[in-house]
Amino acid sequence: DPDGPYGQYFYIRPWHEGEKLPNNWRSYFGGSVWEKLPGHDDRVYLHLFHKKQPDLNWENPALREEIYRMVNWWLDKGLAGFRIDAIINIKKPVPLTVDYPADRPDGLCSAHRMLRGAVGLTDLLNELADRTFRPHNAFTIAELFDWRQEDLERYIGDHGCFDSIFDFAETVLNGSQKGWYDQKPVTPEQYKQTVFGVQKEVADIGYMANVIENHDEPRGVSRYLPEGECSPEAKKMLGGLSFMLRGLPFLYQGQELGLENVSFTDIAQVDDISTKDEYQVALNAGCTKEEALKAINRYSRDHARLPYPWSDAPQGGFTTGTPWLMVNPAYPVLNLAAEKQDENSVWHFYRRLIRLRKDPEYHETVVYGEFEAYLEEQHNLMAYYRKGDKTLLVAGNYQARPQWMKLPAPIRKVLVNNLPSLEEKDGGILLAGYQFLVLEIGCSEVLSK
């Protein structure tokens, strides 16, 4: 009942056929954010995402009390914490009547634009934390796009709303308002500068959650490695560079196997609503079906949602039936059982990184040590220090060609190497293509330079 108390739990507005909608915002999944309320031809409701996901009205105190009750119900049962999805969208510039300049031929503007006019988000988040998370000492990590450096203390500082937020800065690189079909591949230098930029901004304010992929993104190795360069060595390099950053390393299922994007040959193979929308956007812009498929094959999140390949059995050992999405055709080779048997696999490489993080001798440095970029201007070299009670140099040659890297101090110990050998030369290291290293180096020598 839109006129009853629960009608105030949502954003419902009067509207009649032929009238202008309350605003021109486009849903994150395409089309207007306004949908006709079932059973009420004179009302529309707001949904920033799918029409089956109506937005809750967080301005309503009664609604917030219901949310707190549900959160505490879980925490009282012993739940340790929450991953909080899309939380930045709960604050909106009411009364929701502002139109923004259209950014596509459909006359609409991405709902993302409204976030700039939404003031008071941290007030809501602090109330949520005070009423639920803080009394339970719960761990919280938030999906929070478009944060500003001056707001980080309020988000993840000592008294912040959350314990951590995901670093998604890399996922929006080269994004285009026109759509996926207009996006350009991410270069190694763009990736490096973006990652380093976030590390410098966060510094010691708190801990970011470092990711290269998740359920909302394509496979990281297909996105951040140059096309055609998804070798096991390159996958290990990319994973190692992310894992060793200051912050909390997150691995998504299949990342530990080095899974890549698949090649969808027909839009019917896709389940994701945003992918279907972007395919249509590409066609509407004049792309051929082949060009539209190329775009979704690069950026669709369905790549990360395929059945997990447990073995080389039919359907990857996931099921004896028919799964909801195709199985990655690489499953005869890229599967958990095979990688467990191969000591040089991506799976075993991640285990080595995890062991290093837990090693009592290096735990303080890897977990709590400072980040400092090294040779940042050297093209396609991504290198940085982790400085704590020890000094570690993390380095990756982000290209297929070998390149020389100067050493700032003598090597005390090679902790991780994704290749069987290391070539020292002229006071440095000749890094092979996509070679990745974690080196313990002389701390006093570095400090004196």
Regions picked out by a protein language model, each given a short descriptive name:
Residues D1-R412, V416-K449:
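Active-site and adjacent substrate-binding regions of carbohydrate-active enzymes
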